[in-house]
A protein has these predicted regions:
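Extracytoplasmic ligand/sensor domains, especially the bilobed periplasmic-binding protein
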Residues: 1-69, 118-139
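Solvent-exposed loop/turn segments at secondary-structure junctions
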Residues: 1-2, 17-18, 42-46, 70-75, ...
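Extracellular/periplasmic periplasmic-binding protein-like sensory domains
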Residues: 7, 105-179, 188-194, 237
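Structural motif
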Residues: 20-23, 68-84, 153-155
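Sec-exported extracytoplasmic/periplasmic mature domains
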Residues: 29-34, 54-62, 82-89, 106-113, ...
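Periplasmic-binding protein-like
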Residues: 35-40, 88-98, 104, 116-123, ...
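Segments of small-molecule ligand-sensing domains
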Residues: 162-174, 183-243
Length: 243
């Protein structure tokens, strides 16, 4: 919905496969993880994650040794993990999300994948996924996020309000939805109208400066350009709290 495919009344706020892949793949290769094997969800989203991550692996001097594609909602990743182990890649990139990503990480731990020296790179994951996995299993995972609740005083203040209502810290998606809707509603108020053209004009003219984006801007094609953050899951002994 952006770049050459943009429309006059659409905005793309939080992330896409390009930004998610760039941070994680680039950092992993520069840290020595220069050979990759992908375990990929076999539909458009997974294919795009794999394609974009492969581009950044190779652009930074790395090499993709292979890939295995799995159906949505796969209960058993053993054959795919065995292929990843056999390939001997330094990094196993998980180009999937949600239940598939969680299952793949859990089973990789059971297989001893990381204990044998391979690293896991999650190309889309949320803090709720890490909480579900638990730190003993998730420790060391690399992922790229547009938001983390404990990054600044502003992120902590907003996240505490969220926690008081929902009894859990917000994911990047939840924070980004709030950020985008607030920017829209402020533009409606300033325009004194819900006319799409008038509101979009103000949204694009007004910098995005809130608890999600320190220096965001809605580009002419509707993409909100902002910082992304490379994250690594702490080991249990490093963590000072549940979230």
């Amino acid at each position: 919905i952006t770049n050459e495919a943009f429309g006059p009344y659409t905005v793309h706020w939080a992330y896409d496969t390009y930004s998610l892949s760039k941070g994680t793949a680039t950092a992993a290769v520069k840290a020595g993880g220069d050979t990759w094997f992908f375990i990929t969800a076999d539909y458009a989203f997974g294919h795009d994650l794999e394609k974009d991550a492969s581009h950044f692996v190779e652009a930074n001097g790395g090499k993709v040794l292979g890939r295995a594609r799995h159906p949505l909602n796969t209960p058993d990743f053993s054959s795919f993990l065995l292929q990843a182990q056999t390939a001997g890649a330094k990094v196993v990139g998980l180009a999937n999300a949600g239940a598939d990503m969680i299952t793949a990480v859990k089973q990789s731990s059971e297989f001893g994948l990381t204990k044998s020296g391979q690293k896991l790179a999650v190309l889309l994951g949320y803090i709720s996924d890490v909480e579900s996995l638990g730190l003993p299993v998730a420790k060391g995972l690399l992922l790229t996020e547009p938001f983390y609740w404990d990054r600044t005083p502003e992120t902590r203040a907003w996240s505490q309000r969220f926690f008081e209502k929902f009894k859990r810290m917000p994911t990047a998606a939840q924070a980004s939805v709030y950020s985008s809707m607030t920017h829209y509603l402020k533009a409606v108020k300033q325009a004194g109208s819900t006319d799409s053209a008038a509101v979009m004009k103000i949204m694009k003219e007004t910098p995005v400066k809130d608890f999600v984006a320190d220096n965001g801007v809605v580009r002419e094609d509707g993409r909100m350009v902002h910082d992304m953050y490379l994250c690594q899951v702490k080991a249990p002994e490093e963590s000072k709290g549940k979230w």
